[in-house]
Swiss-Prot record:
One of its GO terms (cellular component) is protein phosphatase 4 complex. It comes from Homo sapiens. Belongs to the SMEK family. PANTHER family: ATP SYNTHASE GAMMA-RELATED (PTHR23318), PROTEIN PPP4R3C (PTHR23318:SF25). Residues 725-735, 749-765 have a biased composition (Basic and acidic residues). Residues 769-779 have a biased composition (Low complexity). This is Protein PPP4R3C.
Length: 832
């Protein structure tokens, strides 16, 4: 077989470990006189020059891979590869090499791994992983497809090498030329191979290849290749759609050719990504990341070019705000802005802010207000999308514009009320526009994105504005849907169920949207929404919807009520209890019967929440009003648990009442003691001043009994005729200053007169008030010879150095004694 020639490509590994193509030629194995042995000789196809002359020494390791590659190293870091066009030629040359080295040609490598250094084997492995593409011809399309599809299971370096070959050898234009050939020949097999090849190249995810494939010269041919999916019976005519159906409209003539070309390219790229390429799995997301980035980059460039052209944008806004602009023209202008806002999502935050700031300054909000009241559904939908973009960008700027209108517009003409009206009047059966506008309202009403500064509180200002000017319009559909069912306050569920409930599907969806936003308001607008709900009796009216045939609407009502209960607000709890607003909920549970569904679970969860959180007013209300009705529900322990909570609280309150009654009794007794102590302190104070004023002597037994109970005070017991003096003396010795009974017998009076003269003790004088007044040099206890002057209960001594005054007092005392002898007998009670 010596002398046979086979077509090959010769590659050499450079210092950077990259493969360089030395050229294409014919290889043969011949005897070389210079080397005195067999060698491989490759001559160029173009000029017959020698591309490669390589000796085949007996100890050099060779390897055969992929049926078309023979690889070896001639020196360190100098790898060589012969890439055969025909596997048969590769096998023939491989036999020549094995024969020259005395090896078995059935093996895939001439090196014995156990005998060679590990680094030599690793070098062979590097060469064996080399990717080499055959010539781009019809009969090699299957090989090319195999290489491109198999490279994804190889290391990343192989994919990079393949991308480098495709770029450097202008392989993609050659493939697209073959596409035209196959299409002309109706070569279906070749077209299927081209589909796999082009799809594989796209999944290489290389920006340098995208630049080639998506150029004006190549992009439509790429689309053509992707039409021939082997999984389809007939190819899809995507090129016809892009060429004939997808018309590019310039709302304002674009003079920048680069901008126009970029717009065309981006549209087609998006079409390829969305329509032609299969949706990647979660493991293949990164395969198209560069393509996504490529599209985003294009969009950012388009937006930047338009943003710089102020004349272009000004003209667009002028026509959009012009009342005389035709509806079709206005629709085109609005769609342009919709695409512009969509493209803006590809911008960096700083660039996006600059764009929307430009749009707001040019008057996009007044323009939207004009188009949102048009009859065209497409126009209103596009306006809703644009509005959502603007609110997402800067809700504060939109709120500022809305509040500024209050001074120049009627309530019905306010921008936010226009939004509410369009949401309510959305004619789309699926309420697509209403959903967009609900998102807008939700963002505007979210206090978490409201600014608060020392000078201004956006939250209070905007919410006050909204609840004053807008809330009644927002809730109008809810109030209208329930107005025919207004019932007595104590019987919300007493209306005729045969009356029209909002059973229309579209109306039910709208009411559900309204209730969802009201639920959000309960959570975030505590004061404002509470006042509105209580004033409008909103929960009662919402609960009328519990009779709707739409379960999703009933669940919205339950969420609305549950959010209210979650706050555990006293005003809400009282409102629910006084209005008996649990009745429609209980009725709905009973009407649902034994069906285990979302409605059943939602209602049970509501009661379970009340039980777990132990909201005491609601627990008591539910048990007292509904336990007899709910007692039969035993498949959950919720209602029994509520009864247990109720009984525990009742017992606790009963115990508290008992304890409180006992405390109140103690307080009454304590107050009496305090009053007595106060009286004692008053007497002591007057004693300190030099005189003791005794209160009037009372005959009332109760009064005297109270006085006797006071300890540590000077007590004058009642005058008795019996022998109680001894007992009085004993009491005095125990620490109390007690006056003995004043006796009428002669012996007692004689003794008393002697004591008065001996001790110079002045007898008490009656004051004008009827009290006794002591002003002696000894205490009352000393006057009867008992007690100690230093005792705590002894009346303090008051000195009277003037003897003349004492004599006068003695004389007065004698006169009083005479009067006592002649006057009727009376037993005075002395007590401090």
């Amino acid at each position: 077989m010596a002398g046979l020639r086979y077509s090959v490509k010769v590659y050499v590994l450079n210092e950077d470990e990259e493969w360089n193509n030395l050229g294409t030629g014919q290889v043969s194995s011949t005897y070389d006189e210079q080397f005195q042995g067999m060698s491989l000789l490759v001559r160029s196809d173009s000029d017959g020059s020698v591309i490669l002359r390589s000796q085949i020494p007996p100890d050099r390791p060779y390897g055969k891979y992929q049926e078309t590659l023979i690889v070896w190293y001639e020196a360190e870091n100098q790898g060589l590869v012969l890439k055969f066009q025909d596997p048969a030629g590769c096998q023939d040359i491989w036999k020549e090499i094995c024969q020259a080295q005395g090896k078995d040609p059935s093996i895939q490598t001439t090196v014995n791994i156990s005998d060679e250094p590990e680094e030599d084997f690793n070098e062979m492995s590097v060469i064996s992983n080399m990717v080499v593409l055959p010539d781009c011809e019809l009969n090699t399309l299957d090989q090319i497809a195999d290489i491109v599809t198999s490279v994804f299971s190889s290391p990343v370096t192989d994919r990079e090498r393949l991308a480098e070959i495709l770029k450097n050898e202008a392989y993609i234009p050659k493939l697209l030329q073959l596409f035209h050939t196959c299409e002309n020949l109706e070569n279906t097999e070749g077209l299927h191979h081209l589909y796999e090849i082009i799809k594989g190249i796209l999944f290489l995810n290389e920006a340098c290849l995208f630049e080639i494939m998506f150029s004006d010269e190549c992009i439509m041919d790429v689309v053509g290749c992707l039409e021939y999916d082997p999984a389809l019976d007939q190819p899809k005519r995507h090129r016809d759609f892009l060429t004939n159906d997808a018309k590019f409209k310039e709302v304002i003539p674009i003079t920048n050719s680069e901008l126009r070309q970029k717009i065309h390219q981006t549209y087609r790229l998006q079409y390829i990504y969305d329509i032609l390429l299969p949706v990647p799995s979660i493991f293949e997301d990164n395969f198209l990341s560069t393509l996504t980035t490529f599209i985003f980059s294009n969009k950012a460039e388009i937006v930047s070019m338009l943003q710089k052209d102020h004349k272009f944008l000004y003209e667009v806004f002028a026509q959009l705000k012009d009342e005389t602009t035709h509806d079709d023209r206005r629709c085109e202008l609005l769609f342009f802005f919709k695409e512009l806002c969509s493209f803006s999502q590809a911008l960096q935050p700083q660039s996006k802010d600059a764009l929307f700031e430009t749009l707001i300054q040019l008057g996009v909000l007044p323009a939207l207000k004009i188009v949102m009241i048009r009859d065209d559904l497409q126009v209103r939908s596009a306006a809703a999308v644009i509005c959502a973009y603007l609110v997402e960008y800067s809700p504060s700027r939109i709120r500022e514009f809305i509040i500024s209108e209050a001074h120049v517009c009627k309530d019905s003409d306010l921008f936010i009320n226009v939004i509410i009206k369009q949401m309510i009047c959305d004619t789309d059966p699926e309420l697509g526009g209403a959903v967009h506008l609900m998102v807008v309202l939700h963002t505007l009403l979210d206090p978490r994105n409201m600014l608060t500064t020392p000078e201004k509180s956006e939250r209070s200002e905007f919410l006050h504005f909204f609840y004053k000017h807008c809330m009644h319009k927002f809730t109008a559909p809810l109030l209208a849907a329930t107005s025919e069912h207004n019932c007595e306050e104590d019987d919300i569920a007493g209306y005729d169920k045969s009356k029209n409930c909002p059973n229309d599907n579209q109306t039910a969806q709208l009411l559900a949207l309204i209730l969802e936003l009201l639920t959000f308001c309960i959570q975030h607008h505590t004061f404002y929404i509470r006042s509105y709900i209580l004033n409008k009796d909103l929960l009662r009216k919402a609960l009328i919807l519990m009779n709707s045939k739409h379960t999703h609407l009933i669940l919205c009502v339950l969420r609305f009520m549950r959010r209210m209960i979650c706050l555990n607000d006293e005003a809400y709890n009282n409102y629910i209890i006084k209005g008996n607003l649990f009745e429609p909920v209980v009725n709905a549970l009973l009407d649902n019967g034994t069906r285990y569904n979302m409605l059943n679970s939602a209602i049970l969860e509501l009661f379970e929440y009340i039980r777990v959180e132990n909201i005491k007013p609601l627990v008591s209300h539910i048990v007292e009003k509904f336990y007899n009705t709910l007692e039969s529900i035993e498949y959950v322990q919720t209602f029994k648990g509520l009864k247990i909570k109720y009984e525990k609280e009742r017992d606790r309150q009963s115990q508290i009442q008992k304890n409180l009654h006992s405390v109140l009794q103690n307080i009454v007794v304590f107050r009496g003691t305090i009053e007595e102590i106060g009286l004692e302190e008053e007497i002591c104070f007057m004693e300190d001043a030099g005189e003791v004023v005794m209160p009037p002597l009372e005959d009332d037994d109760e009064f005297m009994e109270t006085k006797r109970t006071q300890e540590g005070e000077a007590v004058m017991p009642p005058l008795e005729d019996d022998d109680k003096f001894t007992e009085t003396k004993r009491t005095h010795q125990e620490g109390e200053a007690v006056m003995p009974p004043l006796e009428d017998d002669d012996e007692f009076m004689e003794t008393k007169r002697n004591q008065e003269h001996e001790g110079k003790v002045d007898s008490p004088k009656r004051t004008s008030s009827g009290d006794f007044k002591f002003s002696s040099s000894y205490s009352a206890c000393a006057a009867i010879g008992t007690g100690s002057p230093s005792g705590s209960s002894v009346v303090r001594l008051v000195d009277h150095p003037d003897d003349e005054e004492e004599k006068e007092e003695d004389e007065e005392e004698k006169e009083e004694d005479k009067e006592d002898e002649t006057s009727p007998k009376k037993k005075p009670h002395l007590s401090s």
